[in-house]
Amino acid sequence: MWKSVVGHDVSVSVETQGDDWDTDPDFVNDISEKEQRWGAKTIEGSGRTEHINIHQLRNKVSEEHDVLRKKEMESGPKASHGYGGRFGVERDRMDKSAVGHEYVAEVEKHSSQTDAAKGFGGKYGVERDRADKSAVGFDYKGEVEKHTSQKDYSRGFGGRYGVEKDKWDKAALGYDYKGETEKHESQRDYAKGFGGQYGIQKDRVDKSAVGFNEMEAPTTAYKKTTPIEAASSGTRGLKAKFESMAEEKRKREEEEKAQQVARRQQERKAVTKRSPEAPQPVIAMEEPAVPAPLPKKISSEAWPPVGTPPSSESEPVRTSREHPVPLLPIRQTLPEDNEEPPALPPRTLEGLQVEEEPVYEAEPEPEPEPEPEPENDYEDVEEMDRHEQEDEPEGDYEEVLEPEDSSFSSALAGSSGCPAGAGAGAVALGISAVAVYDYQGEGSDELSFDPDDVITDIEMVDEGWWRGRCHGHFGLFPANYVKLLE
């Protein structure tokens, strides 16, 4: 067809698109009111769009899909980069077991092509490095072991004549060996067993073995009940210090008592030797101290004298209890190591017995606790000895037992609510004091108070420990923890 148009001038007129309506003077707005209301026709710049054009949407989607596939092809793995990369450039990714067309395998030569002269050490045995280690040549000479008839047996087991000691069998024994056989049971010395002969070898005694002379005294499982105030208080350190000081004081007083008893016995023996005309009263006084039932009789006589004197024998005892009241300062000088105000003063024996004696006094049974019985025993012996020996010096028994009666009388006064008599010399009712420090009672007979608490009805039973009433309780408290009110 193109041949038919050759030589003709064909001109195609191209219609030029009109300008925008705002610049074209002959623009005609052919949009109806419905199209303007519902957006059926798109006008550029109006902000309203026409309905979706399916053809335009299909073309746009296909174009976007082509662009996406092109990106995937560029970014995704390429098949041309396998087995060494594209054109074999990426050698690090080449398959090691893959062989290309340029590979030339070395085929073993045929037997007709091999040089047999180079076997077993190379040609004419020159290649020694390739010779078979287990192969033996014609120049090999083997050393055959000698026959038994040809061996020199004089060199066995230590060499010839035993000279080669380094080759000696360690387990072999010669004729000079003398074994030590264990003795028979009839030949053994059994006196050396379990501690050696007669127990002399102490280093071989069994540590867990106990002899007949090791006897342990029976112990009691009694534990003193702890009050609620003492259990909840935080003064465990003060309690331990107080208990240790009380234990030391008790031991020291027991030693003093034992020394005084021994000294009095010696003096009593000396008096009996010097005055042979009156030995009977001394024997009568020594005999009651030995039997066991004596403490019961003494306790029955010691408790009633507070009210009325039963007999003439108890009168010297009661008068002697009333006279040693001035000895309290001597008793107070014993605790020297507690001058510091915050520290608790040592509790004396009379302080410990203050609360126990009134309890047994209030009960109908007159039997007291067994603790004061040995002290009453010593006191009775002491008083009877004082009647016999007027020139004998006063001992520590009066100092220990004198405050006991005074505290006993003061306890009776405190329990009855009336002032004490002249027997309790240091007791003064109606005294009040204010607490300076916090104190928690360690026992049921002690007070517990806080700072600035007022303590009334104070009884100065001792220099270190007083007795008073606080928060409805009546008991002991340390004197250096309070300040007297004027």
From Swiss-Prot:
- UniProt PTM: Phosphorylated by FES. Phosphorylated by LYN, FYN and FGR after cross-linking of surface IgM on B-cells. Phosphorylation by LYN, FYN and FGR requires prior phosphorylation by SYK or FES.
Q: Which Gene Ontology CC terms are recorded?
A: cytoplasm; cytosol; endocytic vesicle; mitochondrion; nucleus; plasma membrane; transcription regulator complex
Q: Does the keyword Phosphoprotein apply?
A: yes
Major location (coarse): membrane
Which SMART domains does its entry note?
A: SH3 (SM00326)
InterPro entries recorded:
Hs1_Cortactin, SH3-like_dom_sf, SH3_domain
Where are the residues of the annotated region Involved in HAX-1 binding? 27-66
The species this protein belongs to is Homo sapiens
Tell me which residues bear Phosphoserine. S275
Residues modified as Phosphothreonine are T308
What PANTHER family does this protein's entry cite? CORTACTIN AND DREBRIN, HEMATOPOIETIC LINEAGE CELL-SPECIFIC PROTEIN
Subunit relationships: Associates with the SH2 and SH3 domains of LCK. Binding to he LCK SH3 domain occurs constitutively, while binding to the LCK SH2 domain occurs only upon TCR stimulation. A similar binding pattern was observed with LYN, but not with FYN in which the FYN SH2 region associates upon TCR stimulation but the FYN SH3 region does not associate regardless of TCR stimulation. Directly associates with HAX1, through binding to its C-terminal region. Interacts with HS1BP3. Interacts with FES/FPS. Interacts (via SH2 domain) with FGR. Forms a multiprotein complex with LYN and ANKRD54.
Topology within the bilayer: Peripheral membrane protein
Protein name per Swiss-Prot or TrEMBL: Hematopoietic lineage cell-specific protein
Record's compositionally biased regions (Basic and acidic residues): 243-276, 315-324
Provide the function of this protein: Substrate of the antigen receptor-coupled tyrosine kinase. Plays a role in antigen receptor signaling for both clonal expansion and deletion in lymphoid cells. May also be involved in the regulation of gene expression.
Residue windows of the Cortactin repeats: 79-115, 116-152, 153-189, 190-212
- Listed Pfam families: HS1_rep, SH3_1
